[in-house]
């Protein structure tokens, strides 16, 4: 449950990819400026959405295979017959249609992520109204939650911008560039070092903090080495998703601990997610070795 609940961080439409798209676009423009390229290209959120489809499907497939294998050995899940297919379809069709419209409009270039998000919010409100679950109290609580999350993100963004400005002012970005250039083994050693660093930071930091503080510092030097921005963005997105499962501060683990039975120990939750972390790291390695899956 904890692992599959975090698939939304890599499978479009994903808030992590939306945030990462903005960060990678800025990093790519900065890298092009440093290389003297003034007819610049950008990285769109739609590009990341398209690039994340194959890795997302691979992660889901890996989860399914592992779940089937472990269930056959220990028989965790009882077999139940599915009844009421029409009711299931009726429940799934409206949100699936809304996701298709929102995601399709971004990938097709019809709407920006902000415009598509507005359509998605309005569509979700209509669906809630048709289901009879919409009321003023729910709307108030939802608006408050959205405002809280938005405030948190912008607070981190403002702090990260100040940090980045000071860091560049004292020449920190030049130091990072020099460190990358002096690394033995070339650009792939630098890439593996950064991916490992992001993975370790995921044990203690939220993905938003990594996205706005760490990635803007390390992405431009990597892009100047010739890496494709979309491919690099997907690698970092998979890495960021893994941070939700890494103890002790994996947010997915906290959520599961809050709703799980008291008889389930925290250490058992930590042990249970290890195979899923390994699956994600294997998929990450495959994307590194076979970039054509993204490009």
Task: Report each predicted region and the residues it spans.
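Alpha-helical transmembrane segments of multi-pass membrane transport proteins
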Residues: 1-295
């Amino acid at each position: 449950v904890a692992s599959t609940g975090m698939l939304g961080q890599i499978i479009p439409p994903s808030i992590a990819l939306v945030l990462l798209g903005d960060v990678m676009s800025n990093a790519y423009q900065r890298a092009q400026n440093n290389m003297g390229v003034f007819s610049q290209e950008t990285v769109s959120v739609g590009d990341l959405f398209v690039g994340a489809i194959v890795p997302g499907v691979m992660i889901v497939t890996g989860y399914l295979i592992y779940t089937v294998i472990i269930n056959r050995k220990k028989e965790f899940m009882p077999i139940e017959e599915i009844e009421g297919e029409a009711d299931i379809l009726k429940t799934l069709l409206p949100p699936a249609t809304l996701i298709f419209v929102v995601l399709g409009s971004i990938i097709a270039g019809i709407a920006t992520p902000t415009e598509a998000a507005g359509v998605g919010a309005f569509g979700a409100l209509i669906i809630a109204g048709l289901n009879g679950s919409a009321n003023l109290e729910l709307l108030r609580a939802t608006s408050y939650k959205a405002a809280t999350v938005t405030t948190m993100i912008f607070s981190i963004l403002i702090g990260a911008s100040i940090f980045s400005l000071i860091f560049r002012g004292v020449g920190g970005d030049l130091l990072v560039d020099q460190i990358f250039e002096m690394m033995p083994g070339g650009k792939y050693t630098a890439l593996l070092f950064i991916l490992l660093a992001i993975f370790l930071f995921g044990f203690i930091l939220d993905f938003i903090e990594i996205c706005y503080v760490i990635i803007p510092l390390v992405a431009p030097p990597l892009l100047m080495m010739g890496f494709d921005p979309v491919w690099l963005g997907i690698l970092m997105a998979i890495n960021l998703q893994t941070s939700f499962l890494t103890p002790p501060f994996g947010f997915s683990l906290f959520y599961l601990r809050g709703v799980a039975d008291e008889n389930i120990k925290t250490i058992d939750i930590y042990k249970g997610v290890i195979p899923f972390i390994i699956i994600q790291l294997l998929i990450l390695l495959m994307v590194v070795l076979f970039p054509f899956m993204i490009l």
